[in-house]
From Swiss-Prot:
Record text on subunit structure and interactions: Heterodimer of 2 chains generated by proteolytic processing; the large extracellular N-terminal fragment and the membrane-bound C-terminal fragment predominantly remain associated and non-covalently linked.
A biological process from GO: fat cell differentiation
Keywords from the named record: Cell membrane, Disulfide bond, G-protein coupled receptor, Glycoprotein, Membrane, Receptor, Secreted, Signal, Transducer, Transmembrane, Transmembrane helix
Protein name, entry field: Adhesion G-protein coupled receptor F1
Gene: ADGRF1
Naturally occurring in which organism (per UniProt): Homo sapiens
Length: 910
């Protein structure tokens, strides 16, 4: 028969005089220190609580132990000094059988959830008469919590200035406040049945928030009720010493949170502490159902903070050597002080980001030793133990992890080919860089990693494979790859659904090159998860994106993905196009662009054919100039868009992508500014009836507005953002949106502002036309022109406005499929809309075109008839007669009025 082991946990309280054998031992908890009469003792008397674990074999030995505790009576004299046991109690009774430990509380002691032995590995049973704590012995941690006396907690606020000395229990000011509070509360509570002691446990900031703990032998409900009954007495006693804040005094019987750092607290309490020595900042915790949870933390190593300040001193005259030395100093500090506090994480990410931006702007190169220092720094802050602190940081800086990833990629691109190959394999990050040579033409590129997650020996593998067919053009200089398991835990996951990153995050950077197909292989971290999605981190929208990536194969442990380069018209406002509708959007884009370009060319041909017939009044001439430039601007913009769509979206050695962005931006702006010129013309001819601006002056205004303003905006945009590499997106050839400067606003704001202005102009003009002021009468020709302008503007402006309005929708709600389809549809067919509503809507142009086509048709028919008549008659059957056309007259009339015609008639008087 196997006998279980039993324990009786006993609680002793000693007082030790000067020179006592207990001394100052860290293993013994000092409860409080009192100054006593020096005549009786040579020094202060200290009170200790001693917790003893005593083993017994059966119930008889247990009874003997209980009786022994009862026989212990003060004072006891020891040879090392005067020791007095003031109380001795059994607290917890435990028995162990077959590896399972079960404990119950002794008389007047109880469990204080979640203090049941080891809260993580034990379960508190409350259904029985005596609540018991049950757990497996092999799971217990080194420190466990046993049954305690009944405790009641209380807090109140003192209207005095808080000082950091109140956080130090050894300081004089702490002792002053604590001793005064304990004396007054003890007087108020000493007559309560079961009351044993009261002790100040903490002071918090917020005036001075004092927390105290009352210990008693009665039940929690009885002790709490008694303390509440004498609450007024306690407040009056405290008010004699301190100015209390009204309504701040409260007591509660259950501490939701209680630990050695933040003390006790009830639900939703917040407690702020200064950081420990050597750090600057504060740490704030909130009491939640699971205990104290850190919600804010700014603890930055003092050395790091100083280093961050020193960085600004080298920016003005920075050199590669200075930057390299700075990174080396940062690496040394991190290596000597590896603590990954939230403040340290934020500070390191900020420093690395600043180094990256400075190096990119100054075109610095990064040596192999500097790159090794960067990877060592990254390995430290990507420690899997720091994930909890990353979670806290991401509450304040949501995209700090994205910023880190982008920074590491940018710094990696600064390593010259001559410093490669390099390979840094650390515990939490792997980095590899190679120079590209002609062997890539034959064998392609492969990058493989093997990393072990925390608390497991099973490796997680990953692989990047680029086929040799992707290197058939001029070769890139370098290929950089890196991988990390921790990044998958800290990069934000979309709020939609409960997805999680289930593999390593792998990054491959090929500068100045275009890759159209890449295969990726991932080991699953958790093989039981299903329905994998192949995604990439979208730096433009700061989220996971599946555009251009799809699942190739899935086994129980391995997922294979394929990613390709995709471009659609929808990138003008949003680079994210859901993969489910991408073929539709792409088809709409290119078919629509073909029709649009053809329509615009037709617009220009029609204008060229009938330019002289239409050019009569100043208003008509100016309108034609505007329409021609609108068509021309959109035509060139569409061509440049196609150029941008055919080059690599990330880089191009000749700068074609940057040029495409600039000219697309410029000519799309020109389109809108020429529309604004149309609006101004319309308002001018209606409102200022008797004012006539000179033709050359009106043209000067038109061309300055139509091309001058767009040129200024475009040049300023590229001049401000290109040096910091924030001008264009990394994934598509278009203006950037994700960075702080947001150069895309340099297009969106003017375009939408012009659309809004033109709507207002149309409304004003329509009102003026319906109710003209007395004396304001236009000529018939000018009024017809104005009506034509109004029709064109009224239809053309809403179409263009809606187009870019739906584009804004693709940014705000990138997951909405309707935004992308409508946006692509309206944008792709803009040229066709201009042909219909800007050219064919004009009745004069329509009539001229009809006449031209009719004349051509009649001429062909006449030629055919004459040819038929000649073939029916014999040769020379009629003598030559120079007057054979007598009686036949050809009438042709051309005019400049609205009823212009070109008509050919044949009549006979015979």
């Amino acid at each position: 028969m196997k006998v279980g082991v039993l324990w009786l946990i006993s609680f002793f309280t000693f007082t030790d005089g000067h020179g006592g054998f207990l001394g100052k031992n860290d293993g013994i908890k000092t409860k409080k220190e009192l100054i006593v009469n020096k005549k009786k003792h040579l020094g202060p008397v200290e009170e200790y609580q001693l917790l003893l674990q005593v083993t017994y074999r059966d119930s008889k030995e247990k009874r003997d132990l209980r009786n022994f505790l009862k026989l212990l009576k003060p004072p006891l004299l020891w040879s090392h000094g005067l020791i007095r046991i003031i109380r001795a109690k059994a607290t917890t009774d435990c028995n162990s059988l077959n590896g399972v430990l079960q404990c119950t509380c002794e008389d007047s002691y109880t469990w204080f959830p979640p203090s049941c032995l080891d809260p993580q590995n034990c379960y508190l049973h409350t259904a029985g008469a005596l609540p018991s704590c049950e757990c497996h012995l092999n799971n217990l941690s080194q420190s466990v919590n046993f049954c305690e006396r009944t405790k009641i907690w209380g807090t109140f606020k003192i209207n005095e200035r808080f000082t950091n000395d109140l956080l130090n229990s050894s300081s004089a000011i702490y002792s002053k406040y604590a001793n005064g509070i304990e004396i007054q509360l003890k007087k108020a509570y000493e007559r309560i049945q079961g009351f044993e002691s009261v002790q100040v446990t903490q002071f918090r900031n917020g005036s001075i928030v004092a927390g105290y703990e009352v210990v008693g032998s009665s039940s929690a409900s009885e002790l709490l009720s008694a303390i509440e009954h004498v609450a007024e007495k306690a407040k009056t006693a405290l008010h004699k010493l301190f100015p209390l804040e009204d309504g701040s005094f409260r007591v509660f019987g259950k501490a939701q949170c209680n630990d050695i750092v933040f003390g006790f607290g009830s639900k939703d309490d917040e407690y702020t502490l200064p950081c420990s020595s050597g750090y600057r900042g504060n740490i704030t915790a909130k009491c939640e159902s699971s205990g104290w949870q850190v919600i804010r933390e700014t603890c930055v190593l003092s050395l790091l903070e100083e280093l961050n300040k020193n960085f600004s001193m080298i920016v003005g005259n920075a050199t590669e050597a200075a930057v390299s030395s700075f990174v080396q100093n940062l690496s040394v500090i991190i290596r000597q002080n590896p603590s990954t506090t939230v403040g340290n994480l934020a500070s390191v990410v900020s420093i690395l980001s600043n180094i990256s931006s400075l190096s990119l702007a100054s075109h610095f190169r990064v040596s192999n030793s500097t790159m090794e220092d960067v990877i060592s720094i990254a390995d430290n802050i990507l420690n899997s133990a720091s994930v909890t602190n990353w979670t806290v940081l991401l509450r304040e800086e949501k995209y700090a992890s994205s910023r880190l990833l982008e920074t590491l990629e940018n710094i990696s691109t600064l390593v010259p080919p001559t410093a490669l190959p390099l390979n840094f394999s650390r515990k939490f990050i792997d980095w590899k860089g190679i120079p590209v040579n002609k062997s890539q033409l034959k064998r392609g590129y492969s990058y493989q990693i093997k990393m072990c997650p925390q608390n497991t020996s099973i490796p997680i593998r990953g692989r990047v494979l680029i086929g040799s067919d992707q290197f058939q053009r001029s070769l890139p200089e370098t290929i950089i790859s890196m991988a990390s398991l921790t990044l998958g835990n800290i990069l934000p996951v979309s709020k939609n659904g409960n997805a999680q990153v289930n593999g390593p995050v792998i990054s491959t950077v090929i500068q100045n090159y275009s890759i159209n197909e890449v295969f990726l292989f991932f080991s699953k971290i958790e093989s039981n998860l299903s329905q994998p999605h192949c995604v990439f981190w979208d730096f433009s929208h700061l989220q996971w994106n599946d555009a251009g990536c799809h699942l190739v194969n899935e086994t129980q442990d391995i997922v294979t993905c394929q990613c390709t380069h995709l471009t659609s018209f929808s990138i003008l406002m949003s680079p994210f196009v859901p993969s489910t509708i991408f073929p539709v959007v792409k088809w709409i884009t290119y078919v629509g662009l073909g029709i649009s370009i053809g329509s615009l060319i037709l617009c220009l041909i029609i204008e060229a054919l009938f330019w002289k017939q239409i050019k009569k009044s100043q208003t008509s001439h100016t309108r034609r100039i505007c329409m021609v430039n609108i068509a021309l601007s959109l035509l060139i913009a569409d061509v440049w868009f196609i150029v941008g769509a055919t080059v690599d979206t990330t880089v191009n050695p000749s700068g074609v992508c940057t040029a495409a962005v600039f000219f697309t931006h410029f000519f799309y702006l020109s389109l809108f500014f020429w529309m604004l010129m149309l609006g101004i013309l319309l308002a001018y001819r209606i409102i200022l009836v008797f004012h006539h601006m000179a033709q050359h002056l009106m043209m000067a205004v038109g061309f300055c507005l139509g091309y001058g303003c767009p040129l200024i905006i475009s040049v300023i945009t590229i001049a401000v953002t290109q040096p910091s590499n924030t001008y264009k997106r990394k994934d598509v050839c278009w203006l950037n949106w994700s960075n702080g400067s947001k150069p895309l606003l340099a297009f969106v704001v003017p375009a939408l502002a012009i659309v809004a202005v033109n709507f207002v102009v149309v409304l004003l003009v329509l009102t003026k036309l319906w109710r003209p002021t007395v004396g304001e009468r236009l000529s018939r020709d000018d009024k017809a022109t104005i009506i034509r302008v109004g029709k064109s503007l009224l239809i053309l402006t809403p179409l263009l406005g809606l187009t870019w309005g739906f584009g804004i929708g693709t940014i705000v709600d990138s997951q909405n499929l309707a935004w992308h389809v409508i946006f692509a549809l309206l944008n792709a067919f803009q040229g066709f809309f201009i042909l219909c509503f800007g050219i064919l809507l004009d009745s004069k142009l329509r009539q001229l075109l009809f006449n031209k086509l009719s004349a051509l048709s009649s001429w062909k028919q006449t030629e055919k008839q004459n040819s038929s008549d000649l073939s029916a008659k014999p040769k020379f059957s009629k003598p030559f007669n120079p007057l054979q056309n007598k009686g036949h007259y050809a009438f042709s009339h051309t005019g400049d009025s609205s009823d212009n015609i070109m008509l050919t008639q044949f009549v006979s008087n015979e």
